[in-house]
């Protein structure tokens, strides 16, 4: 049984248990006081706040199935794809530059799929810091590489192993305003914080951690409050963690599961605190749910005509872009209820 198929079953079981618990107790808070009450209306009809204003196909940009997308402080899009390189694209869809090739040297990448049966589920994530430095999760080489915005190699950190500062399979990563880098290791099931120079500051995960921090985690950003916004897809929870490594909030989105959707997998937060949750899918279908700051479900992308591979990314000047499962880059306009 492959990784995603296993998570379909795990997610369905987790959601079922959460709903049962919600029916038996009026207060589902954790010991840390976090909100874990499931939103049972996740499958109801809701307005879609998303309008596609522009779309760029992978072929038109010269990309070989994009894996991840980040927006830099310059407003440009930084995209990794299966050709083992980074491509920089202007908001107007002009390819500005690219760098990288297959290999293990500086500036070379080996993005690998989690399972042979899920070739598009590739660990090749990317993040851009406030100063424009670009960080790439080089999963097959068990390291993170840092570059200037023009693609010049700066440094790398990490090596293969299970020790402190090492990786088994580095996956998601994010950068805070101070330049610290947060890396989720999908195989080791932990999250590590590194200084701007690549020194380990802390590591969370494992049996000794708080329950919400045990398992597989996915994240793409630091929100306006400096919190790492993560999804524990084993427990089907969105978890918010401060830069100190301590959990400060959580909720269960009750993401719909099916034979093609393995529950919640990705989350991002906009400038006013709304959380956008997308799923791990076997097929190019599935919704994206939108929750307000009180974790109330307020809107939903229905999953058609595009299903989002990652939750929307928010640019410095209000731009919103998202990566669809077929590799199309979508520019979105979002109008939420009551806005």
PLM region spans:
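Bacterial N-terminal signal peptides that target proteins for export
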Residues: 1-12
């Amino acid at each position: 049984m492959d990784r995603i198929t296993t998570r379909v079953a795990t997610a369905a079981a987790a959601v079922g248990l959460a709903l049962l618990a919600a029916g038996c107790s009026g207060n589902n808070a954790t010991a840390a006081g976090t909100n874990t009450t499931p939103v049972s209306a996740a499958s109801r009809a809701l307005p879609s706040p998303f309008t596609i204003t522009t779309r760029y196909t992978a072929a038109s940009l010269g990309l070989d199935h994009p894996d991840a997308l980040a927006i830099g402080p310059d407003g440009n899009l930084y995209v990794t794809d299966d050709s083992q390189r980074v491509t920089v694209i202007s908001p107007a869809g002009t390819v500005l530059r690219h760098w990288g090739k297959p290999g293990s040297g500086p500036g070379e990448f080996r993005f690998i799929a989690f399972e042979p049966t899920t070739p598009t589920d590739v660990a090749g994530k990317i993040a851009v810091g406030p100063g424009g430095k670009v960080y790439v999760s080089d999963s097959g080489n068990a390291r993170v590489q840092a570059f200037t915005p023009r693609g010049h190699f700066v440094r790398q950190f990490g090596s293969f192993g299970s020790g402190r500062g090492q990786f088994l399979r580095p996956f998601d990563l994010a950068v805070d305003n101070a330049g610290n880098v947060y890396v989720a290791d999908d195989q080791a099931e932990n999250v590590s914080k590194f200084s701007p120079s690549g020194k380990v500051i802390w590591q969370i995960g494992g049996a000794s951690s708080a329950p919400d921090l045990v398992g597989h985690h996915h994240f793409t950003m630091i929100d306006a409050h400096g919190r790492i916004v993560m999804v524990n897809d084993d427990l089907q929870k969105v978890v918010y963690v401060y830069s100190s490594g301590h959990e400060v909030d959580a909720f269960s989105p009750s993401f719909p599961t099916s034979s093609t959707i393995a529950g919640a997998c990705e989350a991002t937060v906009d400038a006013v605190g709304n959380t956008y949750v997308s799923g791990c899918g076997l097929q190019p279908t599935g919704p994206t749910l939108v929750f307000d700051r009180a974790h109330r479900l307020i809107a939903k992308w229905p999953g058609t005509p595009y299903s989002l591979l990652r939750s929307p990314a928010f640019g410095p000047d209000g731009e919103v872009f998202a990566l669809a499962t077929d590799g199309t880059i979508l520019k979105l306009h979002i109008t939420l209820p009551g806005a």
